Design a protein with these regions (language model features):
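ATP-binding N-terminal substructure of ATP-dependent carboxylate-amine bond-forming enzymes
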Residues: 1-101, 105, 117-131, 306, ...
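Phosphate-binding site of ATP-dependent enzymes
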Residues: 158-244, 272-273
């Protein structure tokens, strides 16, 4: 058994979700017989890691500071193996602009988009280009922060009158925003496990919000707000295509260990589009990765054990090389 430093909480806007993920993971690690030191991440992180004398870190952080490569870079400096993707992959996944450009360049379909920084609006007059953007994307348009997760700051603009308010909301979460073509259809997710070279896709999950068309923060994390179907009721070809795109995105962004790929199945065309890749997906009681694993015959403890084993295997492989 290992001494595990469980990193949770932190100071991001997704702190509460991280605490919930961390609580679930801690219970599992203890059931598996590991010695767990739970660390609510803050300015004393390095001191607490050194005091813990851990063999491995289980990163259950979400949002800035934990999912954007910062903690991963620090753990690399300290020589402590950790779960999930490395700094570069985390940076690519966290910044949706970088991720979408990489996916598009690799031929992986993602909704058309334009991205601008706050400085572009303040210093370059980007607001004057909004009519041209709106004409190309057509309404409704999705406006969202470039970084972040859990659907925080995402707004739908049904008309030009809605765009300024949506931009203000998105800029309250980040200094860079994305304006994206809205894909109306079914909200799907494919979780992926394994090293970049030989990952495997888990059954597709479909999220069906009960009260709203949009799978927002409340729908994601409040029990009873969303119906989940896993495996999703899709034809074999669509399922295979969803798996193909998810694995392609996972490899293209350099993910390792585990990740979740969010997709939309467009109702009008039957086409699949990759929305984003989450380098550290939630592990709460309503999260999609545990549901997908369960549908594949992997209970939560086995899922946590595999994620931990992959972290140690990467360290062993690196040391051997």
């Amino acid at each position: 058994m290992s001494r595990v430093a469980l990193l949770k909480g932190g100071r991001s806007l997704e702190r509460q979700i991280s605490l919930r993920s961390g609580a679930q993971v801690q219970d599992s690690l203890e059931r598996l017989g590991h010695e767990v030191t739970a660390i609510d991440v803050g300015p004393d992180l390095v001191d607490r890691l050194e005091a813990a004398r851990a063999d491995v870190a289980f990163v259950a952080l979400h949002g800035r500071g934990g999912e954007d490569g910062t903690v991963q870079e620090l753990l690399d400096v300290l020589g402590l193996p950790y779960t999930g993707s490395g700094p570069a992959a985390c940076i690519r996944c966290m910044d949706k602009v970088i991720a979408k450009h990489a996916l598009r360049d690799a031929g992986i379909p993602t909704p058309d988009f334009y991205a601008f920084s706050e400085a572009a609006f303040n210093d370059l007059g980007a607001a004057r280009a909004l009519p041209a953007i709106e004409a190309r994307l057509e309404f409704p348009i999705v406006v969202k922060p470039a970084a972040g997760g859990s659907a925080l700051g995402i707004k739908f603009a049904a008309s030009a009158a809605d765009v300024p308010g949506a931009l203000v909301a998105a800029f309250s979460y980040d200094t860079k925003v994305i304006l994206e073509r809205h894909v109306a259809g079914r909200d799907l997710a494919v979780s992926v496990l394994g090293p970049a070279g030989t990952p495997r896709a888990l059954p597709v999950v479909e999220a069906i919000p009960r009260d709203e068309d949009f799978y927002d923060f409340e729908a994601r994390y409040e029990i009873g707000r969303t119906t989940f179907r896993c495996p999703a009721e899709l034809g074999e070809e669509v399922t295979a295509r969803a798996h193909e795109l998810a694995l392609g995105a996972y490899r293209e962004l350099g993910c390792y260990g585990f990740a979740r790929v969010d997709l939309m199945l467009e109702a009008a065309t039957g086409e699949l589009y990759v929305l984003e890749v989450n380098a550290i997906p939630g592990l709460t009681e309503t999260s999609l990765l545990p549901q997908a694993a369960d549908a594949a015959g992997i209970d939560f403890d086995a899922l946590v054990a595999e994620i931990l084993e992959l972290a140690l295997a990467r360290e062993t492989s690196t040391a051997a090389g």
